[in-house]
Amino acid sequence: MDYLNNLENNFKEICNECCYKETEKCNYRKCNIGFADYVVRNIKDNSTYSIADGENLIPQDDFKYYEEKAIAKGIANICRLCKECNEGHNENCVIALTRRALEYTQLKDKMEYPGNVILYLMNVSKQKPELAELIKEEYMRIG
């Protein structure tokens, strides 16, 4: 399955629901979904796999409401991408940055990815059990 295309479609759906779409307030540097979409396009277009100090580029002041189920769908696809990756896990890889950008829309604390989806879901459930359950359901559905 093409999880990268799934992510792009997921981001389009989220953006289509946003009241800022195609306005002067629509700026990927200030929007977590816009940032994540930008990173995914760079994976595809430029074969970029890591961004030095990339975590500092993720918008920290995006307080828009995002549908929890749509975010869970994106995170599930990212977890599948991470599982398929053979580059070795690090927090500046584009997959981790995309995941973190989505997490910031739903979770108040930074979430570490331990390299295993089960442990990750356990960590997410400590902050937001309903999000962990949605991620798990989508992860199983697309797998």
Show which residues each predicted segment covers:
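Cysteine-centered metal-binding/redox modules
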Residues: M1-G143
